[in-house]
Amino acid sequence: MDMFEINITSVIQLMSFFLLLYILKKFLYDKYFEVMDARKEKIEGEIKKAEQLRKEAEELKKEAKGELIKIRESADSIIKKAKEEAEEIVNNAKKKAEAEAEKILVSAKEEIKNEREAMIKEVEQRVGEIAVVLAMKILKGTLDEKAKREYLMKILKEHEK
């Protein structure tokens, strides 16, 4: 017997095997590989899309950080400006209050001076009147009319000086 003896059964089996391979390839393997290739392409597409989205997200994150820095700088600038304006307002109000206080003080001193002068005049006038009355009472009985008048005139002249 030969090792490679060919008989009809072997040929039919071999043909059946190749026919089965052809049918499997045509209906199963091709479809399977089409599905697998489509799935592979879809996965690769999703990976590329995810990578693109990640890059876009990183860019947006960088832009957001830049905007946040600009906003913080702007806010700091606004706060600094507001503090400076508030300080200026306070200083102006303080200066205005000091000027007003000085004005009131000068006015009060002037008023006190005027009142003092008025009181001095009034006191001098009353002193003169009282002196005349006292002199009249003292002299009532001791001097005659002419002497009284002369004495009163002398007192009034002294008082006016």
From Swiss-Prot:
Gene3D superfamilies: F1F0 ATP synthase subunit B, membrane domain (1.20.5.620). Keywords: ATP synthesis, Cell inner membrane, Cell membrane, CF(0), Hydrogen ion transport, Ion transport, Membrane, Transmembrane, Transmembrane helix, Transport. GO terms for cellular component: plasma membrane; proton-transporting ATP synthase complex. The keyword Ribonucleoprotein does not apply. The keyword Transcription regulation does not apply. InterPro entries: ATP_synth_B-like_membr_sf, ATP_synth_b/b'su_bac/chlpt, ATP_synth_F0_bsu_bac, ATP_synthase_B_chain. It comes from the Bacteria. It is found in: Cell inner membrane. One of its GO terms (molecular function) is proton-transporting ATP synthase activity, rotational mechanism. F(1)F(0) ATP synthase produces ATP from ADP in the presence of a proton or sodium gradient. F-type ATPases consist of two structural domains, F(1) containing the extramembraneous catalytic core and F(0) containing the membrane proton channel, linked together by a central stalk and a peripheral stalk. During catalysis, ATP synthesis in the catalytic domain of F(1) is coupled via a rotary mechanism of the central stalk subunits to proton translocation. Belongs to the ATPase B chain family. NCBIfam families: ATP_synt_b (TIGR01144). F-type ATPases have 2 components, F(1) - the catalytic core - and F(0) - the membrane proton channel. F(1) has five subunits: alpha(3), beta(3), gamma(1), delta(1), epsilon(1). F(0) has three main subunits: a(1), b(2) and c(10-14). The alpha and beta chains form an alternating ring which encloses part of the gamma chain. F(1) is attached to F(0) by a central stalk formed by the gamma and epsilon chains, while a peripheral stalk is formed by the delta and b chains. This is ATP synthase subunit b. The gene is atpF.
